[in-house]
Amino acid sequence: MAPEPTANGESEIFATALRAHLSETRFAFTGLTGKEATRSITRAVAEWSMASGWRTRCEAPMRYIDPPRLQTGGCRGYWSPPWCAYLDLRLRRKDGPPIAVEIDRSDDSTAVDKLRDEALRGRPALWIRWHGALRAEVPAGVARLHLPTRSSTSPVRYSRAPVTDTASITLGADVTPEARAEALNRDQQRKAEEKRAAARPQAPGPIRC
């Protein structure tokens, strides 16, 4: 019997399948703002998900594996990072764990942390980077699909030629069984800490200083 693909292998498989879909549909755009370009890519990924028979959820809530810390700022406390974060897309399959997707114009985002934690949980994780230099290291278990664009100025607009099957895919290292076991243990500790935090008395409202 063939072994079941690991999350690492599935990330690569799905990145390759998404690239093939974008190539077959000749995905492209011209003269879009940054937000419009991101929405265009998001729609294309959602269409691929639907064609694959999956359910798509936008702005899907997720939790970081490590608990946030209670910080104090001015006259009130706050959790950093917040307890809840959001994935750009979560693609739900009937035959496997959901696929986490982040879509970013640059490396300056929380995508690396979110996708790293999803991969450590054994879930396929895709990072779609569509503009700018690639400087961030791809986390273990994550596949990055690069869709470079051209930009114009005054005003800034982005254009993307039709995707081909040569679009670059970069893979992170394999998630080792030891790393996954340690992450799952920390995840359980985080859940317990979150319950304790929820049971604490609510802090009073802002204090005028």
Which residue ranges define each predicted feature?
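Active-site metal-binding core of divalent-cation-utilizing nuclease and nuclease-like domains
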Residues: 27-95
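Surface-exposed beta-strand edges and their flanking turn/coil or helix-capping segments
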Residues: 69-72, 113-116, 159-160
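Domain-level recognition of nuclease-like catalytic cores that cleave nucleotide substrates
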Residues: 130-209
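Nuclease catalytic cores
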Residues: 2-46
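Catalytic cores of nucleic-acid endonucleases
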Residues: 84-86, 97-150
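Generic detector of low-complexity/intrinsically disordered segments
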Residues: 72, 91-93, 128, 173, ...
